[in-house]
Amino acid sequence: MKTTIKQAKDHLNQDVTIGAWLTNKRSSGKIAFLQLRDGTGFMQGVVVKSEVDEEVFKLAKEITQESSLYVTGTITEDNRSDLGYEMQVKSIEVISEAHDYPITPKNHGTEFLMDHRHLWLRSKKQHAVMKIRNEVIRATYEFFNKDGFTKVDPPILTASAPEGTSELFHTKYFDQDAFLSQSGQLYLEAAAMAHGKVFSFGPTFRAEKSKTRRHLIEFWMIEGEMAFTNHAESLEIQEQYVTHVVKSVLENCKLELKILERDTSKLEKVATPFPRISYDDAIEFLKSEGFDDIEWGEDFGAPHETAIANHYDLPVFITNYPTKIKPFYMQPNPENEETVLCADLIAPEGYGEIIGGSERVDDLELLEQRVKEHGLDEEAYSYYLDLRRYGSVPHCGFGLGLERTVAWISGVEHVRETAPFPRLLNRLYP
């Protein structure tokens, strides 16, 4: 009977065949231990010399790392294993023998591993990170579908940009200028006027010459836009969404979190409502903590965000930033028009901003004024302005960076490990 490592628990004390790769092996005289993986998980295969043909035991000792195999044997309980079971191997069939696999069990430098990213993905920890990434995506669809959102796919090639063109990748669209999308927001706002609540999930591109552990050139973003929604209601949706995702990972990725040695007690504390602190109060807090490198009207850097988040040890909303450091489309704060109705959600443990969101300007005259103030081409945004001409309503939206969120939940140091094939300032290969 052919099965998988994940399903093998359903076949205790039965003989099964599993297609797998050999990740590592060791032997102690009359017993060989094979570390097997098949994409669904990792399992040990035990080959006892006295219980198999001589050729099988010889093969078990000689087979090379990352060779592909069909392994047949009996599934037995093993309480020492993370899975709780292992295979007593009876026969091995080599599908393809691997030669001189470059990523050996010894330690390798990050650049070497990134050069071999196509192979590094096979390792146990990288496999666990990708499984958590997959669970975040699955839980995202679950949340938005259950809450009545409609998925909309905005274009990747655009003629306009939500936040200006200075950090965009430029290309030619036949005889026109085009840019790789840095956000689907403007298109989602249009879709929200048709469907009420919409979301998207897709790649975004930022031509930022940044080398920090938080930044990728290409990353994936989950964006939501909601008609007839105010700023306070939007924050509630955002915190409910993030809480749902964290709980889903805790429930469905226990083994992966264990492999990554993640301190799950920090994730178990994540619950609504999240703390909120205004930009003004955040500036005062930082001053009280000895930060003298930040003044009102300046954006926060990584050390500032980390200090604020660590104070709460939870995801925290920083609200109502100064108008002059935020994009043109954000609604003024009626209590202080030098600020806007916006919020950044800062993850704890130094992972930084994972969500940026705001209430959108819904008045045509104000939006036209903002477009001019920011030096944007009004013609390029004519469709966006149309949304305010024909039945404008209060509406809000937000965007969550997938890779940063996965890094935080997984506890990995750098976002490069949370994308299958990360695009960094100095890396376009593989």
From Swiss-Prot:
Keywords: Aminoacyl-tRNA synthetase, ATP-binding, Cytoplasm, Ligase, Nucleotide-binding, Protein biosynthesis
Main location class: cytoplasm
Main EC class the enzyme belongs to: ligase
CDD domains assigned to the protein according to its UniProt record, in alphabetical order: AsnRS_cyto_like_N (cd04323), AsxRS_core (cd00776)
Catalytic reaction equation(s): tRNA(Asn) + L-asparagine + ATP = L-asparaginyl-tRNA(Asn) + AMP + diphosphate + H(+)
GO terms assigned for molecular function: asparagine-tRNA ligase activity; ATP binding; catalytic activity, acting on a protein; nucleic acid binding; transferase activity
Keyword tRNA processing: no
Localization annotation: Cytoplasm
GO cellular component terms, semicolon-separated: cytoplasm
UniProt cross-references to SUPFAM superfamilies, sorted A to Z: Class II aaRS and biotin synthetases (SSF55681), Nucleic acid-binding proteins (SSF50249)
Record EC number: 6.1.1.22
GO biological process: asparaginyl-tRNA aminoacylation
Cross-referenced NCBIfam families: asnS, PRK03932.1, PRK05159.1
Family label: Belongs to the class-II aminoacyl-tRNA synthetase family.
HAMAP family registered for this protein in UniProt: Asn_tRNA_synth
Assembly: Homodimer.
Protein name: Asparagine--tRNA ligase
Natural source organism: Staphylococcus aureus (strain MW2)
